[in-house]
């Protein structure tokens, strides 16, 4: 994704392939609480960014993985437990010499998927969230015994993997049923979700929160399971679900992607509309109040100037969205939102007030560039085909991907083609 929210910070990749970060605890150099977007040094061209609780990872266009932030328990995968103030490259040898195509960061662990559809994991593992068969932390990336993986998502203490055939495997902390195995037990190995009717669906993308999990299938249906205490499962009640359960409350629209925050959910439809459910404290739902929502409510499109959205991200208490034109909007907890004050020029001290509705981040704070524009594809398959600069229309980068992954992306693209200048 060109956009990712951590616990209290935000990352975005601009259409110029530059990474910007702001908020608290993102590991910039020097370690500061950046109150408005600031460029992050690192590789020249970045394609994807993933934010965790206090660390983050980025994938460069050459397939290299860089990590930064808190290092305790090894989430950076650099062989020690030390923090890094700058983005630091993980040696390619850590992945068997194969390029990385996507990464996901959890509470204190990281998962990387390579062009060979292999999974590697590092970091905290007290709940088995690394999927390596034990509960020992890993300071370096360790290969997971699960092949053919094309998408992944990290929750706080659990992980979700999607295979090329659309099946889903989960591991880690199982309390509240967030693993989807009809129990509350943990798993130390990625375990197939085999309950019907979910097993018959072909999952395209997944999202994982603190204690709940979401999956979007190829038919545009949303499945939810885990903790439902605030309505974050989009099922109209506060009950937990131990098995994937179909959510059908989005105005009849097909779902394109979903994001999990701390006890809340954001859902993006194929029409570019945004729906929100769950905990509403600090305005994280973008619905002009702080009330919880048990039934998903549509975020007023006027806040986005009626522009269709192409990406959403959810953090602990803040949210972000990108329009098809590359405009960035944020809302929720003020420390992580990246707005300037009302001082002349709009570039003064940051405004730390919470926002109850989506508010546009001035493009000048992102170097005048928009957020990298991706096609409206499932979240983990939103590859940078639409980013024309820096050779991001395919070429050698696509050639390095598994044939099945490319096929699935092209199938998704065939539903809609978006062109931008």
Describe the function of each predicted region.
Residues 1-419:
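Eukaryote-biased RCC1-like beta-propeller repeat architecture
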């Amino acid at each position: 994704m060109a956009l990712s929210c951590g616990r209290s910070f935000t990352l975005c990749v601009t259409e110029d392939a530059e990474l910007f970060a702001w908020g608290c605890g993102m590991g910039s150099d020097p370690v500061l609480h950046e109150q408005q977007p600031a460029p992050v040094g690192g590789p020249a061209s970045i394609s994807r960014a993933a934010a965790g609780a206090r660390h983050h990872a980025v994938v460069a266009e050459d397939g290299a993985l860089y990590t930064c932030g808190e290092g305790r328990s090894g989430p950076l995968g650099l062989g020690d437990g030390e923090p890094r103030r700058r983005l630091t490259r993980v040696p390619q040898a850590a992945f068997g010499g194969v390029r990385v195509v996507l990464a996901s960061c959890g509470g204190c662990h990281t998962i990387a998927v390579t062009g060979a559809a292999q999974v590697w994991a590092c970091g905290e593992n007290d709940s088995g969230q690394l999927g390596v068969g034990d509960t020992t932390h890993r300071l370096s990336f360790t290969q997971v015994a699960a092949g053919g993986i094309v998408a992944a998502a990290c929750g706080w203490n659990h992980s979700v993997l999607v295979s090329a055939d659309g099946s889903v495997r989960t591991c880690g902390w199982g309390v509240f049923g967030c693993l989807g195995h009809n129990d509350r037990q943990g798993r130390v190995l990625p375990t197939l979700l085999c309950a019907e009717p979910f097993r018959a669906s072909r999952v395209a993308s997944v999202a994982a929160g603190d204690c709940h999990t979401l999956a979007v299938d190829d038919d545009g249906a949303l499945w939810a399971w885990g903790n439902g205490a605030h309505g974050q499962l989009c099922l109209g009640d506060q009950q937990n679900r131990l098995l994937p359960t179909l959510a059908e409350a989005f105005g009849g629209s097909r779902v394109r992607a979903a994001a999990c925050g701390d006890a809340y959910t954001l859902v993006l439809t194929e029409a570019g509309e945004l729906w929100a459910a769950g905990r509403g404290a600090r305005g994280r739902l973008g619905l002009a109040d702080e009330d919880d929502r048990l039934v998903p409510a549509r975020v007023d499109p006027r806040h986005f100037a009626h522009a269709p959205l192409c990406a959403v991200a959810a953090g602990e208490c803040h949210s972000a969205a990108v329009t098809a034109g590359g405009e960035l909007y944020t809302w929720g907890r003020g420390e992580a939102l990246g707005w300037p004050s009302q001082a002349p020029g709009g570039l003064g001290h940051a405004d730390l007030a919470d926002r109850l509705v989506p508010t546009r981040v001035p493009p000048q704070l992102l170097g005048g560039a928009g957020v990298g524009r991706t096609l409206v594809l499932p979240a983990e398959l939103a590859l940078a085909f639409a980013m024309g600069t820096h050779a991001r229309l395919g070429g050698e980068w696509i050639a390095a991907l598994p044939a099945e992954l490319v096929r699935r992306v092209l199938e998704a693209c065939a539903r809609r083609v978006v062109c931008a200048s």
